[in-house]
A protein has these predicted regions:
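Non-catalytic alpha-helical scaffolds and adjoining flexible linkers that form interface surfaces
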Residues: 1-22, 27-151
């Protein structure tokens, strides 16, 4: 149950709900993935946000959404990589379970995606940062690959 809790995180996905509302999926620092209804225009993806959350059910009520930094827009491979990150967070992260290492790695990965276009070996760099994120997520979920031993 959340009573006027402030959440810090990122908008992962949203879809229209009724005339002036959206169902949104957030990846928050405090509670991991949180789903809710937002009665205002959602923030762009990949932007750090702060939002007020209330509610007892799995679908919270979000109010007072605030974008914390200037918008970041990805192009080309960085756009598709960001979309991929959001999809695996949405599909793999359990509802309302904090994943602090994964959240930190998500932030690091977004920063690295901003630098992708200026990187000398962009394709190799992209694969590396995506694998680092996947490894952090799987490790925190308890499905990490043990590279120390072989079968």
């Amino acid at each position: 149950m959340m009573r006027n809790e402030v959440l810090h995180g990122y908008l992962i996905h949203h879809r229209k709900y009724r005339e002036k509302s959206h169902i949104v999926h957030l990846f928050s620092q405090e509670y991991g993935r949180v789903d809710g209804i937002l009665r205002q225009t959602p923030a762009p993806q990949y932007q750090p946000i702060r939002v007020q959350a209330t509610g007892k059910s799995e679908l919270k009520n979000f109010t007072q959404l605030e974008i914390l930094h200037q918008p970041v827009f990805f192009h080309g491979d960085a756009f598709f990589a960001g979309f991929y990150l959001n999809e695996i967070v949405l599909r793999l992260c359990p509802l309302e379970e904090a994943l602090p290492q994964t959240f930190r790695q998500y932030q690091v990965t977004l920063l690295q995606l901003q630098q992708l276009a200026s990187h000398a070996q962009a394709d190799l760099f992209l694969r590396q940062i995506l694998r680092q994120f996947e490894h952090a997520l799987l490790q925190e979920l308890g499905y990490a690959i043990d590279f120390a031993s072989d079968a």
